[in-house]
Structure formats: C-alpha cells, structure tokens
C-alpha cells in the first residue's frame, strides 16, 4: 500500500522555489508536489514544473486558490519576499485557516525554526519562519556554545556568492540582518546578536562561507568544541555539504583587558571562533549556492517532520 503524503504548493518560482520543488520530487517521503506558483509566465521554474507534471499558475496566490487541486493542498512553502509573504499568508488563511505555511522569506510573522535546534517545539505551528540562509548555517553553532556556557554576544558574517543572490535576496538585505540578529538571540540563546551579509563578486563563484564569533562565560574548551562538532554532524544529516572549515579557535579575554561591546559594555570570558563552509547539493542550483541549498534543505526537513507528525497523529 502506498504511503499517504501531504500535498505541497510552492509560491515563488525563482532559484529557491525551483530547487525546493526538485528536492520534493526526488526526495519527498511524506510530501509530494501539488502546485508551483509564480508571477512571471516566462520563468524557468514554472516551465520546469510544467515539464515535470506539476500544476502551475503565473497568477500568484489568487491563481493558487483557483487551481482545481487547491482543496488538496496541505502545506505551502513561500519563497517570495518578506512583504509578499505577509499578504500571501493573510489571503490563504481567509480561504483555508488551518493551512501550514513554511516561510523562506525574512518576514518572520511565525516563530523561527532552525530544525536541528528547535524543530520539535514547532510541529504544531501553522506558520514557521526559516530565518535566513545565514541563520540556518550559524545559529546551530551559537546554540552549541549556548548549551555549554552563557552566551553574552554572538556575531555572524555570512559570505555568499554574488551570483547566487537573486532579486529576492537582494531586496531583503535589511530584513536579512534584522531577522538573523533576532534569531541569534531567540534560537541561538545569545543575549545580543549581530548579523552581517557579504555578497562576494569573485569569479569563479565561491561557496558559502560563514564566520561565527561567540563571547561567552568562561567554559571548558573541550566541552564547547565537542558540542560544536556534534551540532555540525546533526546539521549534515539534512545539509551534507555543511562542514567546519578548520578547528574551532578559542581566545581567553581576561578581566584585566576586557573587550568593549556596544550595547553590552565590558566583556571578559571565552571567545569562540567557528569557520564554516556550505556546499550545495546541486539539485537545481550550482554547488557554490550553498546559501540557497541550506534554506531549501532546512525547509524540506521541517515540512517533512511536520507531515510525518500530522500523518501519524
């Protein structure tokens, strides 16, 4: 007997939406594609979806609601923009109040979800926010330190290939920094978080690189390092191209020579530096676009776990 699957629609037929569609078609265990929704009739994503036998519309969320199979759609991934997501969520809830929304924009109208850190707490949420690519890569590392020692401050720098940043990413730079900074605090456990994104124009394009600086209370270095390595291995379960680029680095900040952190004041304790790289699985996007791959992989892992819980309830 075939396993029952939940039907998913994707709004946004750009880089992220198309990669996500291919992941669901190839690897969906509890999910299957129901519809691909865009606003550009000439988009490659819609053409690809049609070729793969997926229902499509270029009329946005209204087009989705008008599709004959809309009644069967259980989960909607939104890969548009922060502003569009707010409208999409409101409109879909007018028609189907209980629909599940997985938000891949920085809108964050629902609670943040970083699968390896807090997915089990989000299984009943009707709208979850996948933070940002930088957040999905770095917040697990902040949380790894946080479970060993109190984290006073965490700063992340996400460097992504300029070529992998489509119009949606570029339009949402401010939202990226705000949402990631907030999630570093809410999910990562830092008292204060800061996020910086760098679009690297290098050719040939470089894979995603992330640097995480964590200032915490004094702690056992071996315990912190073990926690970080364990967390990295957990992320690799759904993002195989995620890895520590080099050994974790530690610096003691003595009370006699404290750091001055804006908004926090003087700090002494342990500084932990983590260097990451994320290579994409190259399902649709090139391997250098690890920043987009980690978003689609995290979104799929989240929706699969939610679908599994719903189907076995």
Curated annotation (Swiss-Prot):
State the source organism's domain of life: Bacteria
InterPro entries attached to this UniProt entry: Acetaldehyde_dehydrogenase, Acetylaldehyde_DH_C, NAD(P)-bd_dom_sf, Semialdehyde_DH_NAD-bd
Catalytic reactions of this protein:
acetaldehyde + NAD(+) + CoA = acetyl-CoA + NADH + H(+)
UniProt cross-references to Gene3D superfamilies, sorted A to Z? Dihydrodipicolinate Reductase, domain 2 (3.30.360.10), NAD(P)-binding Rossmann-like Domain (3.40.50.720)
Disulfide bridge map: none
Binding of NAD(+) occurs at 13-16, 164-172, 291
Q: Which GO terms describe its biological process?
A: catabolic process
- A GO molecular function for this record? acetaldehyde dehydrogenase (acetylating) activity
Write out the catalytic residues in the record: 133
Q: Name one Pfam family in it.
A: Semialdhyde_dh
- SMART domains linked to this entry: Semialdhyde_dh (SM00859)
What EC number is given for this enzyme? Answer: 1.2.1.10
Q: Does the keyword Nuclease apply?
A: no
Q: Which UniProt keywords apply?
A: Aromatic hydrocarbons catabolism, NAD, Oxidoreductase
HAMAP family (UniProt xref): Ac_ald_DH_ac
- Similarity-based family: Belongs to the acetaldehyde dehydrogenase family.
The identity of this protein, by name, is Acetaldehyde dehydrogenase
